[in-house]
Amino acid sequence: MPFDPSTLKYDAAGLIPAIAQDAATGEVLMMAWMNAQAVARTLESGRVTYWSRSRQSFWVKGESSGHVQELVDFRVDCDRDCLLVTVRQTGPACHTNRRSCFYTAVREGEEVELMAPLL
């Protein structure tokens, strides 16, 4: 059956969360937002495209930094309200220059930094 981005469940702002996962390691890299057009652009181009809520514009991951996300697989969850994009990540995924945006853990009530920025 052909995929139609309009069949996804978007929030009131027309957005859906998209979790990026490294295709080789399974590591969760980041979470960002997509709208229907970002979904379509991602599937058409093979380059993961998000919607920047702060800039109110499309954000092709790595367009300015070179830290691109090449789409490997695109999955829809059971409620159709969240996406999982598995990617080939070039360089760090996080704007803090870390491999993953999930670099802080809470352990025994304390925040622990799990990874330092890449050089």
Curated annotation (Swiss-Prot):
Record protein name field: Phosphoribosyl-AMP cyclohydrolase
Organism expressing this protein natively: Ruegeria pomeroyi (strain ATCC 700808 / DSM 15171 / DSS-3) (Silicibacter pomeroyi)
Binding annotation for Mg(2+): D77, D79, D81
Family under the similarity heading: Belongs to the PRA-CH family.
Annotated positions binding Zn(2+): C78, C94, C101
Protein's GO biological process: L-histidine biosynthetic process
Requisite cofactors: Mg(2+); Zn(2+)
Keywords: Amino-acid biosynthesis, Cytoplasm, Histidine biosynthesis, Hydrolase, Magnesium, Metal-binding, Zinc
Keyword flag 4Fe-4S: no
